[in-house]
Regions:
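Secondary-structure junction motif
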Residues: 179, 192-213, 278-287, 296
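A late-sequence structural motif
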Residues: 107, 256-296
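Beta-alpha-beta core module
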Residues: 155-161, 165-167, 227-275
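A short LG(V/I)-centered, amphipathic sequence patch enriched
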Residues: 41-60, 77
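Short beta-strand-centered segments that line the small-molecule binding cleft or hinge
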Residues: 110-114, 131-172, 208, 234-237, ...
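N-terminal winged-helix
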Residues: 30-31, 88-119, 123-128, 132-136, ...
Length: 296
């Protein structure tokens, strides 16, 4: 399978038309494009397109291949950029960092500031996501580093622990009965409609940290990142498990954070692939991070 074929496929998927892709994007004849896509379908052994007079759409297999094709082209772009800039004496290039929502991202920001002071032509690309999103992109080579909230399996990675802990609790409306308490217990959660992140719902370790199987509670919704979940809470749709300090709960905010008792906290780690071949910008970031943490 050639990269050209993947580019052709993505153009057809984007334009939803063989003729538009051929004439407006790829500048090849339509028969040439059709032949290339037919050969791709034969190579993969699946039908990728549903062709009609109005437009061309993707089959279920086509949608799955589109996701992989986009990942391949993104990785190719990273690689081309990395090697084009590697020969320059001054460190120029990109660092790709992913992480969950946590106040500890300030360590990443401080390391980037330190790195930028020395290497101002390094660009940083930040991706927000839960541990599954981040480790998947890390494994695919689309990220250089990931900031993960524990408990998390980090056996596949090199890592440094951050000197910080995040506190777990509930995000509730200020007029919610639990808002009047200084702390909440697991017993307080009985019959309370709850929102939990998809990551925590899938992790036995989190149930162990909480001291209760989340599936035994009244979880009415799951979320990926906390902001949209906070809108549900603001509308009175329950209380959300979350970490302290991710949202502004002061002033005119309708929301407040109530920590658990006994206190439940999570450590934080920055991870990267074992035995990596770092680009110069990625190596510069790791050096800056370790300096920020007093490790170098």
């Amino acid at each position: 399978m050639e990269l050209r074929t993947i580019r052709y496929f993505l153009a057809v998927a984007e334009q939803e038309s063989f003729s538009a892709a051929a004439n407006n994007v790829l500048f090849v004849t339509q028969p040439t494009l059709s032949r290339q896509m037919q050969e791709l379908e034969e190579e993969l052994g699946v039908q990728l397109f549903v062709r009609s007079n109005k437009k061309t759409t993707l089959t279920e297999e086509g949608l799955r291949f589109k996701k992989r094709a986009q990942e391949i082209m993104e990785l190719v772009g990273h690689t081309e950029k990395e090697f084009a800039e590697a020969s320059k004496e001054e460190i120029v290039g990109d660092v790709y960092i992913g992480g969950g929502e946590t106040k500890a991202f300030s360590f990443i920001a401080a390391a980037c500031k330190r790195m930028q002071a020395k290497h101002p032509k390094i660009r940083m690309h930040i991706t927000s996501g839960n541990a599954q999103d981040v480790t998947e992109k890390l494994d695919q080579g689309l990220l250089d580093f990931g900031l993960l909230v524990e408990p998390v399996d980090k056996s596949k990675y090199e890592f440094v622990e951050l000197p910080a802990k995040d506190t777990w609790g509930l995000l509730v409306r200020k007029d919610h009965p639990l808002a009047k308490k200084g702390f909440v217990t697991i017993r307080d959660l009985e019959n309370v409609p709850l929102l939990a992140s998809r990551q925590t719902m899938m992790m036995r370790e989190f149930s162990g940290l909480l001291g209760r199987d989340l599936h035994s509670l009244n979880v009415i919704a799951t979320y990926n990142l906390i902001y949209n979940a906070s809108v549900f809470v603001e509308q009175g749709l329950g209380a959300a498990f979350c970490l302290e300090g991710l949202l502004n709960t002061g002033g005119k905010s309708k929301l407040t954070f109530v920590p658990f008792t006994p206190l439940r906290t999570s450590g934080l780690v920055v991870v990267w692939k074992k035995s990596p071949v770092f680009s110069k910008p990625a190596a510069a970031f790791l050096h800056s991070l370790k300096q920020e943490l007093g490790m170098e």
